[in-house]
Amino acid sequence: VRGYQAIKRFKQWEGDKSKLHRKIENARVGFQNQRTRFIMDFKEKFWNNVDDFLHRGQRTWTEWRDHLVKRILGLGNAKTSFGLEMAFPNECEVTCMDTHLFQFYGLDQTKDAKHYKAIEADWLKQCEAKRVPSYIARCIYWDKNQNKRNSRYWSYCLEK
């Protein structure tokens, strides 16, 4: 959350790598060199081909997510899925299988990463059977796991 809050005002650092680096460093989230490089790389790719990031075309959700993972340095399946979930909460057919959901399946995310797509497929199937969007089900599970009544403890950072 601190890292996002530090850089969310794009116009304050747009095109200025050293200013972006300072903002990330001051947020004290670590890995400022890599984060700066990854964010600058994403900025260039995004603004050079916006449609590639906003429209999946004929791709399945999984194909689109996998395509984006290859294009966005520093993001894997979970964080890319999270972005898609937030952008398309009701129709998204990929889900952020974070450490908590790996634990739900009795797995360790570090050791069992190869099972990501299998547990994601199961999660999506279970959600579809219950007629609940997977993102909504995941948010409910995550909030409950964090002993929170709702997602406001982190989502406030997306406002203003």
What are these regions (language model features)?
Residues 10-13, 46, 157-158:
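Extended hydrophobic/Leu-rich segments
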Residues 35-43, 51-160:
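C-terminal accessory module of base-excision DNA glycosylases/AP lyases that mediates lesion recognition
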Residues 1-31:
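Structure-specific DNA junction-binding interface
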Residues 23-47:
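Extracellular-facing segments of soluble proteins and assemblies that are Gly/Ser/Thr-biased and enriched
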Residues 1-2, 15, 47, 109, ...:
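Short alpha-helix boundary/capping elements
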